[in-house]
Amino acid sequence: MKFVDEAFIDIAAGDGGSGCVSFSHEKYKEFGGPNGGDGGRGGHVYAVADVNLNTLVDFRFSRRHEARNGQHGMGSDMFGAKGDDIILKMPVGTILTDAETGEVLFELLVPGEQVLIAKGGDGGFGNLRFKSSTNRAPRSKTPGWPGERKNLKLELKVLADVGLLGMPNAGKSTFISAVSNARPRIADYPFTTLHPNLGVVRVGPEQSFVVADLPGLIEGASEGAGLGHLFLRHLQRTRLLLHIVDLAPFDEGVDPVAQAKAIVRELKKYDEALYEKPRWLVLNKLDMVDADKRAAIVKDFVKRFKFKGPVFEISALTREGCEHLIKTIYQHVKQVQKSEQPVEEVDPRFVPLPPESPETP
């Protein structure tokens, strides 16, 4: 399931340092020559494709990125130090476009690929550069050149790591809005979500995963009922399914266990492989259940549902239990990503030998 994640950033390479006007001052040497050094180059801005990243969420929290300016030249023929470069880590597949013209500037398609996206300004010349046979004591210098400045649009086609599964009005949209930057339409009636919504859950710096809120399922969805199998196919490429169940339906005649079993039947009818995909049970709306009855209700549900996998109890509205859930999801997603990476072939000629065991006397 692919969606487009985007972010806008302003980048500025460093300005070059100015040249220096200086003359040599030595004992017994009345007219020392020019010795003003050049200014240092401004820092460059690079972008590198990092295989460990899968979203652009970090760039929404830090939009402006500036490299350091080069230092000014000094006397005694000393050139100014160059400004420090900065490297922006981006997910593989990121497209960098000029936000003003729409021109595609770069595409990061290869893991580890590094491109120069803003060039630092060159340093200015010191007066040593202007010495000639007719001008023995030049007092000229030039300022440093400004670094490049750009407004960039970053685009990334992202694959959802986690798919939300459940009946209409189970609280999926509330959950995704509570843990991510997505803002789906939320209301107290079925089929509020008419299109898949994508949310990026930020666990920490350079730590995030993608979750998809799909339209709710009803019995017969595998044959196209309700919003149908159009959205069931979106779940096939996710790494984890969260089956969200409403523990406190408004209609007292509705049995949450029966609804949950109907969802599982639809999964199995549609695709056996989808049914076998890792699936966690998330019991939602605990804030609407009496605290004294929670444990008994949860125990009864799990027993009747006959679920053997991980079970989480949350309230998407109050965020109770959400923090633990998203950290556990992130750990699972990273493990799956690691297992999906191809094993590097090692030339047997260069395999290190195991250390020799010490000889026993």
From Swiss-Prot:
BP GO annotations: ribosome biogenesis
Domain Obg: 1-159
Cellular location(s): Cytoplasm
Bias (Pro residues) ranges: 351-361
Binding site for GTP: 166-173, 191-195, 213-216, 284-287, 315-317
Sequence segments annotated as region (Disordered): 339-361
InterPro entries: G_OBG (IPR031167), GTP-bd (IPR006073), GTP-bd_Obg/CgtA (IPR014100), GTP1-OBG_CS (IPR006074), GTP1_OBG_dom (IPR006169), GTP1_OBG_dom_sf (IPR036726), OBG_GTPase (IPR045086), P-loop_NTPase (IPR027417)
One Gene Ontology term of the molecular function aspect: GTP binding
Gene Ontology CC: cytoplasm
Main subcellular localisation: cytoplasm
Gene3D superfamilies according to UniProt: GTP1/OBG domain (2.70.210.12), P-loop containing nucleotide triphosphate hydrolases (3.40.50.300)
EC supergroup of this enzyme: hydrolase
Binding-site residues, Mg(2+): 173, 193
All copies of domain OBG-type G, residue ranges: 160-334
Cofactor(s) in the UniProt record: Mg(2+)
Keyword annotations from UniProtKB, A to Z: Cytoplasm, GTP-binding, Hydrolase, Magnesium, Metal-binding, Nucleotide-binding
UniProt-listed Pfam families: GTP1_OBG, MMR_HSR1
Enzyme Commission code(s) on record: 3.6.5.-
PANTHER family noted in UniProt: DEVELOPMENTALLY REGULATED GTP-BINDING PROTEIN-RELATED, MITOCHONDRIAL RIBOSOME-ASSOCIATED GTPASE 2
Assembly, per entry: Monomer.
Function: An essential GTPase which binds GTP, GDP and possibly (p)ppGpp with moderate affinity, with high nucleotide exchange rates and a fairly low GTP hydrolysis rate. Plays a role in control of the cell cycle, stress response, ribosome biogenesis and in those bacteria that undergo differentiation, in morphogenesis control.
Family recorded in the similarity comment: Belongs to the TRAFAC class OBG-HflX-like GTPase superfamily. OBG GTPase family.
Name the UniProt record assigns to this protein: GTPase Obg
Organism: Polaromonas sp. (strain JS666 / ATCC BAA-500)
